[in-house]
């Protein structure tokens, strides 16, 4: 079961979490949400099992633009490798679909590409941190998202963003970003891994 989580509850989970990479990641996400005062406007969603928080999604939902902007997915330290990130993703997109959201966008780090490919994402550009930008219509399930992606390989107009978004994404090329040599190599390898789901060449069709 997933539900929105208040700031104090997440702070308590952080206080009780052992030191580790996931705890640092969750702390950074918590700080970001606090800094932008998003706990009031867009509270995170948390997956619970046996009344224990397992994973958390930080995202904004815009009724005006009909966009879901997903910032981070965090698994609580010690709960890795149990499928909690996939569970919260599936439940979260279903909730957003029921809220009449129409598109979802996010930036995917090179290290997360393998996991995100299982979510049915397509990719268009590279941000300043070397992450791959993803933006597509929101479907209710991962399977429907993957079905749409397969169709988009032959009909890219099915997933193209608006003209304004396409113009912005065209400017975000790997070659133009201020990345270190190591970052550039990691991002290049991620693009190769994405393969046919790297749809950058079709952005001009949206102009």
List the predicted regions and their residue ranges.
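Conserved hydrophobic beta-strand within the GNAT/NAT acetyltransferase core sheet
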Residues: 70, 103-108
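Conserved active-site alpha-helix within GNAT-family acetyltransferase domains
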Residues: 98-101, 109-133
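C-terminal "cap" of GNAT-fold acetyltransferases
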Residues: 109, 129-207
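A conserved beta-strand-loop-helix scaffold within acyl/acetyltransferase catalytic domains
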Residues: 28-50, 55-67, 71-74
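Conserved acetyl-CoA-binding loop-helix of GNAT-fold acetyltransferases
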Residues: 81-94
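Short amphipathic alpha-helix that is part of the acyltransferase structural core
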Residues: 1-35, 168-172, 183
């Amino acid at each position: 079961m997933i539900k929105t989580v208040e700031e104090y509850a997440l702070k308590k989970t952080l206080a009780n979490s052992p030191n580790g990479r996931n705890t640092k990641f969750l702390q950074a996400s918590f700080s970001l949400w606090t800094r932008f005062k998003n706990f009031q406007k867009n509270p995170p969603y948390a997956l619970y099992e046996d009344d224990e928080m397992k994973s958390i999604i930080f995202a904004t939902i815009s009724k005006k633009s009909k966009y879901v902007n997903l910032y981070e997915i965090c698994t609580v330290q010690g709960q890795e490798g149990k499928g909690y990130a996939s569970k919260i993703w599936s439940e979260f997109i279903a909730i957003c679909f029921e809220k009449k959201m129409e598109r979802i966008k996010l930036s995917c780090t090179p290290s997360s590409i393998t996991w995100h490919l299982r979510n049915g994402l397509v990719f268009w550009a590279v941000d300043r941190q070397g992450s791959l930008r993803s933006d597509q219509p929101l479907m209710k399930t991962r399977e429907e998202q993957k079905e749409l992606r397969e169709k988009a390989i032959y009909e890219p107009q099915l997933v193209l963003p608006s003209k304004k978004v396409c113009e912005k994404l065209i400017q975000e090329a790997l070659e133009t970003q201020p990345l270190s040599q190591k970052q550039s190599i990691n991002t290049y390898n991620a693009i190769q891994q994405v393969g046919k789901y790297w749809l950058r060449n079709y952005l001009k069709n949206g102009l």
